[in-house]
Amino acid sequence: MDSELSQSMVGSYLNPPERMHLPSFTQNEAFQNCHPGTPPKMFNSPNNQALVSALKTLQEKIRRLELERTQAEDNLNLLSREAAQYKKALEEETNERNLAHQELIKQKKDISIQLSSAQSRCILLEKQLEYTKRMVLNVEREKTMILEQQAQLQREKEQDQMKLHAKLEKLHVLEKECLRLTATRQTAEDKIKCLEEKLKEEEHQRRLFQDRACEKTNCLKREPPQQRDHKFRTPTFERKKPFRTTSQARANPQSSGEPVSICDSLSELLMTMEEELDQMNMEHRELLRQTMQPGNHSVSEDIEQELEQLAKKMESKGDQISKLKKHQDSVRKLQEKIENSRINESSGIHGNPKGSKNLKTSPRKCVSETSSFQRDRGFQPVQVHSLQSKLRRDDIKWEQ
């Protein structure tokens, strides 16, 4: 019986009493019908009634406990939700605090950087203030010096005015002297004009004389060749030596005069270029001496630039002098060759009095020699001309 009650009324943890179904009246009747011989002892005894009432009270308590348990579960769920919300709010608050802390650290760093920059600016401003103080002191000193210089200039101006007054007096005297000199110059110009007129007349007379001489030479050229041959025909053995000597005497100054004049002009040009080089050396030394003296930096830079330009000019001048010396040597060698050739030609003419072979072998040479003997000072060797043109074109480079 206890087991049946325990199974029917009490229930278990898995099957609580509120979920158990009590047997209804029909079920009890069916049960009684199934067991008709058994009397209902359970409902008749007082203990059973007490037990049923106890079970009812117990069932009520179990219901209450179940209600409390459900309420407790609801409260627990509510508390868990509130705890989750609180945790979330706490996390958000901590995140906000962390962000605020980081922002505060960043602001502190920015403030420290600004403070360091402000300190550096303060140091720079202090230095600038010190520099401005020094500048003000220097300006005051310069102001005092300028005032002193102005006073000195005023005194010098007064002295200059006195000197100017004296110079004006001298200028007045010089003007009088100038007027006198202009009068004398006018008279001298009149005399010069007279002399120029006389010179013009003399030039006119000289031209007339030259025209007459040209007419006479033309008349001599127009004479027939027989008369000229008759005039100049002489014995060959008597006239050959004088003709050669005179022609040689004429040809030697003509042939040697041009190279000698070229050599003289080259030597004069070389001397002038060497004098210019010496002058450049003196200027170079003077500029070096100026650079050694303490002075302004810009002036020293200008002097250095002048030194560089002067050094380049000296180098070019040295190259020109060396080239000119080489050409002077070549001209001398050429002159020696020409003289040797002239000597050989003259010795060949003297050694062959008949001159038949030379005339046969080189008729042009003989014709050129005879024509050169008959010319005046218009003879110029071809080699000297070529050398002169080469020297003028290529090697003499004048500085601009």
Swiss-Prot record:
GO terms for cellular component: centrosome; cytoplasm; microtubule. Belongs to the translokin family. The keyword DNA-binding does not apply. InterPro entries: Centrosomal_MT-associated, Cep57_CLD, Cep57_MT-bd_dom. Residues 244-258 have a biased composition (Polar residues). This is Centrosomal protein CEP57L1. The modification Phosphoserine is found at residue 45. Residues 314-342, 391-400 have a biased composition (Basic and acidic residues).
